[in-house]
Design a protein with these regions (language model features):
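Nucleotidyltransferase catalytic core that binds NTPs
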Residues: 1-182
Length: 182
């Protein structure tokens, strides 16, 4: 077990696959830094790459704060003490800024489902970060995806069963599913 670990993701519809990833990473470290990417969807860096789905506005309906709250409440609900993790912005689109948010002596825990996952591992290693791939799976092996969660919200389907209870509660209390349906 390492002292400090880190993970990163968009978490645009925190789902059970994200929780599997977060909880496995937490098992491997005493303190976990959770980096949230695309924290400023209006950033010029994001706009320059808007042709990629992960940078399009409709793929990013939840604000940084909303995602921070969903993650925090879901991690605590899962039994992780609040003092054992933190959540920070994570500028994957501007890698040279990452050290402003995550110290260089952490171990990044990654999962790989596609080339984008491999690219992130490679980018972090080039920057001098130690990485550990927790698993590599095919896209078909995903528990679910944020895309699927958002699609079910838009269609009035059963998105709730794909998300942690605390995240569902937060979404419903703040009527966030309406943001996805716009």
């Amino acid at each position: 077990m390492v002292a400090i670990g880190a993970v990163q993701g968009r978490f645009q519809g925190l789902h059970m696959g994200h929780m599997e990833f977060l909880l496995e990473a937490k098992k491997r470290c005493q303190f976990l830094i959770i980096g949230v990417t695309n924290y400023d969807i209006h950033s010029q860096y994001i706009k320059n790459d808007a042709k990629l789905n992960r940078f399009q506005e409709q793929a990013n309906p939840f604000t940084y704060f909303e995602r921070l709250m969903m993650i925090t409440e879901s991690m605590v609900e899962a039994g992780v003490p609040r003092e054992e993790f933190t959540i920070v912005p994570f500028p994957i689109e501007v890698p040279e800024k990452i050290p402003n948010f995550v110290p260089e002596d952490v171990v990044f825990f990654q999962t790989i489902y596609d080339q984008w996952g491999r690219n992130k591992v490679e980018q972090l290693q080039k920057m001098g970060y130690q990485t550990e791939v927790m698993w590599e799976r095919t896209d078909a092996d995903r528990l679910t995806s944020g895309t699927q969660v958002r699609k079910l919200m838009q269609e009035g389907g059963d998105w709730e069963s794909l998300m942690p209870k605390a995240a569902v509660k937060y979404v419903k209390e703040h009527h966030l599913e309406k943001k996805v349906c716009r």
